[in-house]
Amino acid sequence: MSVMVVRKKVTRKWEKLPGRNTFCCDGRVMMARQKGIFYLTLFLILGTCTLFFAFECRYLAVQQSPAIPVFAAMLFLFSMATLLRASFSDPGVIPRALPDEAAFIEMEIEATNGAVPQGQRPPPRIKNSQINNQIVKLKYCYTCKIFRPPRASHCSICDNCVERFDHHCPWVGNCVGKRNYRYFYLFILSLSLLTIYVFAFNIVYVALKSLKIGFLETLKETPGTVLEVLICFFTLWSVVGLTGFHTFLVALNQTTNEDIKGSWTGKNRVQNPYSHGNIVKNCCEVLCGPLPPSVLDRRGILPLEESGSRPPSTQETSSSLLPQSPAPTEHLNSNEMPDDSSTPEEMPPPEPPEPPQEAAEAEK
């Protein structure tokens, strides 16, 4: 007996999330829509390292030390792992307010500010919060309909509010925020070391080959090495400079967004309330602190829309999927067997009982 199982398509929350992000692997991977520069990053790293492992490492492992390709492989794998983690993870997107929540916030704002006369500009929607004896302003996001937490900002590219927003990095194809900043920093740090490492041993390789066949002949025989040197030379300055800048920000417990806006170094000279005044403590908090869980329920299941027909319950569904076996019947006489074609409403009424024998004789 064959049983047909009807499966309904489950709608995940990531399919209905607002914003300009793209999702893969059933919501497990989250990126920005503009991924062209991210693919360029992958191509440059993979292409340069492939040439280095294919040509220079084989020669240097024999002539110098077999540890050279081993250390290069470790740097390469660590750089790729941190890049993919920073690119594919949730940077700390804050969910938008539901319609009921947005209406409640609007009522609170109207009750606080009062009715604004027509033609006049409404006052700025700001709340004050105290952090380490410093007043921090919480701004209202007109897109997400929420008061943003401290250090959060709205990314115009991804169209989402991100907690502890640092910047939007096209090289990793994602925003850099509270949940992936440490991986971004480790990526640019390891990439700087890898670039210096490949560049230095390319120079060593050219020098060793030049001692045997000459400098010009070496350049003619190794065009891949020349290409690697050019890529590493022009990449080195930007990557190392970016790493130094973010090392400075980590030491101060500051974000790129705050540094650009001059939040703690402007005219007011307001002290940074998030800094511990100690470089070691700031580095430990930013890079080694507990990683907060994602508040964006990407893989949650949306509830079924209410319709006229009630969906079957779990017990009804499970019982309907099981093969039904006929109930055992007792041996009945032909006189006692009921008619299958008749329903309880169609069964004939019972015959009236016969009068007692004594009553019949009295009537006679």
Swiss-Prot record:
Segments for region (Disordered): 303-364
Pfam families found in the cross-reference section: DHHC (PF01529)
InterPro entries reported for this sequence: Palmitoyltrfase_DHHC, PFA4/ZDH16/20/ERF2-like
A molecular function (GO) term: Ras palmitoyltransferase activity
Keyword annotations of the record: Acyltransferase, Endoplasmic reticulum, Golgi apparatus, Lipoprotein, Membrane, Palmitate, Transferase, Transmembrane, Transmembrane helix
Catalytic activity: L-cysteinyl-[protein] + hexadecanoyl-CoA = S-hexadecanoyl-L-cysteinyl-[protein] + CoA
Subunit structure: Interacts with GOLGA7.
PANTHER family: PALMITOYLTRANSFERASE ZDHHC9 (PTHR22883:SF71), ZINC FINGER DHHC DOMAIN CONTAINING PROTEIN (PTHR22883)
Protein name, entry field: Palmitoyltransferase ZDHHC9
Gene: ZDHHC9
